[in-house]
């Protein structure tokens, strides 16, 4: 039997023996009001997808069809999305996407206290019901394409008990990640979580090796280390801060370079992975998609990114004036109506209306937004269902924008939400729950 056939058979067996846990309970506080009413993984991305669709699509494309989604903060819109768009796996074949919500009590004692605790609190159902041999743990809030079966194969081949996905990042950004050092066999020799002075890769003084928040564990080893960790004083119940250091101390921790399993390389061979955890990074990652050859190819059918297909009418474009520049370098989703308006370098989600003589430039406009006549929107993120009145100007005078809206830390991006606009218009702002 050839090596390629043996490898494919090994991968097939590995994925069948693996349970995926997607940690999707995070708020994403650096996104401010954009995640006030939705968890970060449920945030819209790329015109008609959600952030969690990337992790889920990677699973399906990798042959991993036994998936648990661990939820906590503002989970309603996420749960609706999963029920409407991800309920196609045949459970009679042992395939599923199950929701694992935090079982909060009145005293808050059973909220997930950290990433490791989120797995620990579900350990009984994992061990007794799902019974996996391997557990793949993913963050539900990153944008990337990866073949997880290759990571599983590397995990088994190295005789690791725990394997962490890693990626090279600029050293000045590495303080936001767990940073590691490895030997020639990719065995992790040092690991520090979010260091102030990140260590560099040997012979690459400006680059560090960072954790992607992706882990493969032998299931029995994970049960054991979680049981030991829960009784440890002063623990933060976190994989990066508590579990990985234990695995490092026990010399069973290995690294898997993302370059070995990345499925999203651009034409220059560069790998693509983004943490869209700030307003600037969320805006930039969406705007990047409008270029002719974006780093992330959302049209690649060899590794499709699935989602919840909404039933909308086709978009309509009315141009009755000769001096109006048509839509230019933009993504326009279904059900949009553009009337004598200029749209350039922008992403419009479903059912956006832009009225006459308005200009939308370098902006990300979420679903069901209405933009009135003679408006100028530049470098904006417009949240869902916002109504922009006629003659509104945003993104031209940053100091005026600071008084009315949320301006990003770099001063480049302006976030506009429904409550901000109502307050500006003198309307009473009440707490509302939207079916997002």
Swiss-Prot record:
Protein family membership: Belongs to the bacterial/plant glucose-1-phosphate adenylyltransferase family.
Broad EC category: transferase
Classification via NCBIfam families: glgC, PRK00725.1, PRK00844.1
UniProt keyword Nucleotidyltransferase present: yes
Binding-site positions, alpha-D-glucose 1-phosphate: 112, 178, 193-194, 211
Name the UniProt record assigns to this protein: Glucose-1-phosphate adenylyltransferase
Reaction(s) catalysed by this chain's protein: alpha-D-glucose 1-phosphate + ATP + H(+) = ADP-alpha-D-glucose + diphosphate
Top-level division of the source organism's lineage: Bacteria
E.C. number: 2.7.7.27
Keyword set, alphabetical order: ATP-binding, Carbohydrate metabolism, Glycogen biosynthesis, Glycogen metabolism, Nucleotide-binding, Nucleotidyltransferase, Transferase
SUPFAM superfamilies: Nucleotide-diphospho-sugar transferases, Trimeric LpxA-like enzymes
Subunit: Homotetramer.
Pathway: Glycan biosynthesis; glycogen biosynthesis
Pfam family, one: NTP_transferase
Main function: Involved in the biosynthesis of ADP-glucose, a building block required for the elongation reactions to produce glycogen. Catalyzes the reaction between ATP and alpha-D-glucose 1-phosphate (G1P) to produce pyrophosphate and ADP-Glc.
Biological process terms in GO annotation: glycogen biosynthetic process
PANTHER family linked: GLUCOSE-1-PHOSPHATE ADENYLYLTRANSFERASE, GLUCOSE-1-PHOSPHATE ADENYLYLTRANSFERASE-RELATED
């Amino acid at each position: 039997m050839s090596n390629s056939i043996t490898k494919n058979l090994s991968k097939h067996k590995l994925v069948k023996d693996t349970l995926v846990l997607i940690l999707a309970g995070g708020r994403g506080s650096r996104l401010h009001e954009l995640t006030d009413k939705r968890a970060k993984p449920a945030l819209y991305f790329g015109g008609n997808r959600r952030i969690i669709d990337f992790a889920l699509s990677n699973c399906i494309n990798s042959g991993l069809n036994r998936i648990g989604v661990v939820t906590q903060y503002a989970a309603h819109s996420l749960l609706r999305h999963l029920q409407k768009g991800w309920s196609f796996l045949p459970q009679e074949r042992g395939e599923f996407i199950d929701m694992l919500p935090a079982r909060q009590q009145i005293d808050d004692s059973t909220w997930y206290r950290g990433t490791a605790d989120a797995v620990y609190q579900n350990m009984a159902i994992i061990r007794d019901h799902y019974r996996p041999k391997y557990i793949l743990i993913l963050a539900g809030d990153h944008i990337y394409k990866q073949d997880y079966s290759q990571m599983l194969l590397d995990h088994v081949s190295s005789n690791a008990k725990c394997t962490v996905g890693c990626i090279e990042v600029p050293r000045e950004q590495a303080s936001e990640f767990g940073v590691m050092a490895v030997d020639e066999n990719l065995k992790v020799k040092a690991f520090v979580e979010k260091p102030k002075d990140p260590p560099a890769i040997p012979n690459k003084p400006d680059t560090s090796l960072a954790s992607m928040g992706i882990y493969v564990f032998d299931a029995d080893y994970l049960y054991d280390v979680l049981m030991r960790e829960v009784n440890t004083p002063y623990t933060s119940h976190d994989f990066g801060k508590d579990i990985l250091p234990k695995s490092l101390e026990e010399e069973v921790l290995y690294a898997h370079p993302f370059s070995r399993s990345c499925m999203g390389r651009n034409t220059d061979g560069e790998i693509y992975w983004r943490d869209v955890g700030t307003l600037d990074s969320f805006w930039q990652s969406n705007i990047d998609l409008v270029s002719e050859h974006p780093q992330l190819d959302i049209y690649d059918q060899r590794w499709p990114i699935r989602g919840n297909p909404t039933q909308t009418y086709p978009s309509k474009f009315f141009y009755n004036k000769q001096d109006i520049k048509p839509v230019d370098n933009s993504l326009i989703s279904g059900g949009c109506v553009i009337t004598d308006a200029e749209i350039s370098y922008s992403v419009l989600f479903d059912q956006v209306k832009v009225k006459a003589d308005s200009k939308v430039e370098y902006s990300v406009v979420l679903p069901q937004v209405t933009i009135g006549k003679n408006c100028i929107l530049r470098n904006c993120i417009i949240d869902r269902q916002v109504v922009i009145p006629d003659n509104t100007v945003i993104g031209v005078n940053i100091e005026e924008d600071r008084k009315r809206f949320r301006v990003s830390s770099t001063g480049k991006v302006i976030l506009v939400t429904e409550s901000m606009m109502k307050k500006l218009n003198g309307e009473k702002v009440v707490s509302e729950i939207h079916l997002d």
